[in-house]
């Protein structure tokens, strides 16, 4: 059904609004006879090469790190081909087809090698639900378990992501590991709680050595000692605990208002 799928979305949201001739749109037909698909894929690769290669490749990223329909396990030398879609990819595509039962079991996709030969690659990811896989793609060693991680091998690849999708990246979640920080009260609390998790110690048991061993020596400099930093964070957290509203039903709480932003 030509009204469904990713190409229909591209047509409705992009191609119908720009001045591009239909003959300059090269897509993968969904009705190719099975016996012609291999030849079609070979010819598609030749057409890309004849056109001078792909100038800009724009991608999304699936929940398992797939780019295009290159599922986990795809090798970096893969080219345009027919693939069987796994259950995760079919769920990702559900919104394009209206219902999971409408999603095809197979698809033609550009291969990893084809994508990496593009002059520029841009990957888009938005939302908190993409945070874990974005971190894996950017910060872990490139590997077949996360095909998007192969973009680390490209000389001109960019990830365009919002703050929610970037939320688990070290530079966002634990910035003290990679740069000097502007130590706001909230960031100090987050760093000290993280240090407690790493050392398996309560706040008031943290030592100067703990701070130094885990890259938080800046806080020792800022507060002169682990003791001072510990006390500050302990008191900050303690003051976020409130019993308000409390007391008897209909009791007058006029003289003990709660802060709008206790944390």
Language-model regions, residue ranges each:
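N-terminal low-complexity segments that are often proline-rich with Ser/Thr-Pro
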Residues: 251-262
């Amino acid at each position: 059904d030509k009204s469904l799928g990713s190409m229909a979305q591209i047509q409705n949201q992009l191609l119908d609004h720009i001045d591009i001739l239909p003959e300059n749109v090269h897509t993968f037909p969904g009705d190719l006879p099975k016996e012609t698909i291999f030849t079609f894929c070979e010819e598609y690769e030749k057409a890309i090469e004849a056109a001078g290669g792909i100038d800009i490749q724009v991608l999304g990223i699936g929940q398992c790190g797939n780019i295009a329909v290159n599922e986990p396990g795809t090798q970096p030398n893969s080219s345009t081909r027919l693939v069987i879609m796994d259950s995760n990819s079919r769920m990702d595509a559900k919104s394009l087809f209206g219902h999971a039962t409408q999603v095809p079991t197979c698809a033609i996709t550009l291969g990893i090698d084809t994508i990496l030969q593009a002059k520029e690659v841009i990957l888009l990811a938005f939302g908190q639900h993409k945070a874990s896989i974005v971190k894996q793609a950017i910060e872990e060693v490139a590997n077949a378990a996360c095909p998007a991680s192969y973009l680390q091998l490209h000389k001109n690849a960019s990830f365009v992501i919002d703050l929610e999708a970037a939320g688990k990246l070290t530079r966002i979640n634990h910035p003290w590991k990679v740069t000097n920080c502007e130590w706001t009260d909230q960031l100090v609390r987050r760093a000290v709680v993280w240090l407690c998790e790493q050392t398996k110690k309560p706040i008031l048991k943290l030592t100067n050595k703990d701070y130094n061993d885990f890259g938080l020596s800046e806080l020792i400099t800022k507060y002169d000692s682990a003791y001072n930093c510990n006390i500050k964070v302990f008191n900050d957290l303690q003051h976020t605990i409130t019993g308000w509203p409390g007391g008897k039903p209909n009791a007058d709480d006029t003289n003990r208002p709660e802060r709008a932003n206790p944390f």
